[in-house]
From Swiss-Prot:
InterPro entries: Dyskerin-like (IPR012960), PsdUridine_synth_cat_dom_sf (IPR020103), PsdUridine_synth_N (IPR002501), PUA (IPR002478), PUA-like_sf (IPR015947), PUA_sf (IPR036974), tRNA_PsdUridine_synth_B_fam (IPR004802), TruB_arch (IPR026326). NCBIfam families: CBF5, PRK04270.1, unchar_dom_2. It catalyses: uridine(55) in tRNA = pseudouridine(55) in tRNA. Its EC number is 5.4.99.25. The gene is truB. Residues 233-308 form the PUA domain. CDD domains: PseudoU_synth_hDyskerin, PUA_Cbf5. One of its GO terms (molecular function) is tRNA pseudouridine(55) synthase activity. Pfam families: DKCLD (PF08068), PUA (PF01472), TruB_C_2 (PF16198), TruB_N (PF01509). Belongs to the pseudouridine synthase TruB family. Type 2 subfamily. Keywords: Isomerase, tRNA processing. This is Probable tRNA pseudouridine synthase B. It comes from the Archaea.
C-alpha cells in the first residue's frame, strides 16, 4: 500500500482510538472472528453460538456454507455486521472432492475443467435461498489437484455467490457421466484465510479465561478489529474535521482529505479511514487518485455505507437542509 500525501494533518488523541488498542469490551462489539466451521450446523447456527458465547446482542456470518461444508466462516460481532456486504467483494476459494458416476478419460476431465474457467452461467439449486433465475458467475481459477479413479480433488477461486454443488453437477453433465459433490471446504472467504480460522471451543475457552481470570491475551489473538476485514480495500485518509460529517452520510469533499492510496479508480469501492486507522465509511470514488490530488475543492467520494457511529469525533460542519439530511440517512441503512 502506497499512500500519497495531499495535505499534512495531525490527529487529536482525545477522540477515537487505534483500532488495535481498543479496550476488550469495545473490541467484542466492533470486531470479528473467523470460525473454522465444522460439518453439521448451519452457518446461522454457528453465528448464533458465537453471539451467545460472547454475550452479544447480535452477530452475523459473512457467506453461507451448507451444513456439511467446512472451512473459513467469518462472523461479524455487534456493530461489525454492517461490514458483511463488503466482505463479499473479493473472490472465495474452495477445495472440493467431486465423484463421477462413470469412468472418464483424464484428458476429457482436464478439457472440461478448462471449459468451466471464466464466465459461466448458473441456475441456483432447488434448495437455494434465492430466486432460481439464471445468473452469470466468474471462475477465476480451477485446478485439478488429484484424480483417483472416479474421484477428483480440485481447487477453485470463484466469484462470491457461485454454487459449487451446481458447478460439479454441470461439469459431470458436460463429461457425460454425471457427478456429485462429495466434500467441500472453503479455504478463503473474501479477505479471510483458512489458516486464521479458529475452533468454536478455542473461542469459548479464551472468553471464559478473560471473564474468570481477567486475562484477555488469548481472546485478543482470536478477535480482530473490524478494520482487519477491510484490508482488501484501497484507502482515503481523512482529517479529524471531516470524520463526523462522513459519519452522518455526507459526501467526502477534497478539503477533508489528508492522504490517498495510489491507483484508486472510479470503478471500485474505497475505504474512508481516520488518521488513527479507524474505518469511517466506504464509498464510490468520483475521480481517480491523480485527479483527487489535483483538485482543491468539490466532491471526491460518494458515501455508500457508514461504519463509524456519529459523535466519536467533534462536529465541525454546518447543518444541511432537510433534503440532504434525508439522503444522508438513507445511506446509513
Amino acid at each position: 500500500m502506497e499512500l500519497i500525501v495531499k495535505e499534512e494533518s495531525k490527529t487529536d488523541y482525545n477522540y477515537g482510538s487505534d483500532p488495535y488498542n481498543r479496550d476488550i469490551k469495545t473490541l467484542l462489539n466492533t470486531g470479528l472472528v473467523v470460525i473454522d466451521k465444522p460439518s453439521g450446523p448451519t452457518s446461522h447456527e454457528v453465528a448464533a453460538w458465537v453471539r451467545n458465547m460472547l454475550n452479544l446482542v447480535k452477530a452475523g456470518h459473512g457467506g453461507t456454507l451448507d451444513p456439511k461444508v467446512t472451512g473459513a466462516l467469518p462472523v461479524a460481532l455487534g456493530n461489525t455486521t454492517k461490514c458483511v456486504p463488503i466482505w463479499h467483494i473479493p473472490p472465495k476459494e474452495y477445495v472440493c472432492l467431486m465423484h463421477l458416476h462413470d469412468d472418464a478419460k483424464v484428458e476429457d476431465i482436464e478439457n472440461i475443467f478448462k471449459e468451466f474457467t471464466g464466465r459461466i452461467h448458473q441456475r441456483p439449486p432447488l434448495k437455494a435461498a434465492v430466486k432460481r433465475s439464471l445468473r452469470i458467475r466468474k471462475i477465476y481459477e480451477i485446478e485439478i489437484l488429484e484424480i483417483d479413479g472416479r474421484d477428483i480433488l480440485f481447487r477453485t477461486k470463484c466469484q462470491s455467490g457461485t454454487y459449487l454443488r451446481k458447478l460439479v453437477d454441470d461439469m459431470g453433465e458436460a463429461l457425460g457421466t454425471s457427478a456429485h459433490m462429495q466434500e467441500l471446504r472453503r479455504t478463503i472467504s473474501g479477505p479471510f484465510y483458512e489458516n486464521e480460522a479458529v475452533y468454536l471451543q478455542d473461542l469459548l475457552d479464551a472468553y471464559i479465561f478473560w471473564k474468570e481470570d481477567g486475562n484477555e491475551e488469548e481472546l485478543r489473538k482470536l478477535v480482530k478489529p473490524l478494520e482487519y476485514g477491510l484490508q482488501h480495500l484501497k484507502k482515503i485518509i481523512v482529517k479529524d474535521s471531516a470524520v463526523d460529517a462522513v459519519c452522518h452520510g455526507a459526501t467526502l469533499y477534497s478539503s477533508g482529505v489528508s492522504k490517498i492510496e495510489k491507483g484508486i479508480g472510479t470503478d471500485e469501492v474505497v475505504l474512508i479511514e481516520t488518521l488513527k486507522g479507524e474505518a469511517v465509511a466506504v464509498g464510490k470514488p468520483l475521480m481517480n487518485t491523480k485527479d483527487m490530488l489535483k483538485t482543491e475543492e468539490g466532491e471526491v467520494v460518494e458515501i455508500t455505507r457508514v461504519i463509524m457511529e456519529p459523535g466519536i469525533y467533534p462536529r465541525i460542519w454546518k447543518k444541511r437542509n432537510k433534503n440532504d439530511k434525508t439522503k444522508a440517512e438513507s445511506k446509513k441503512k
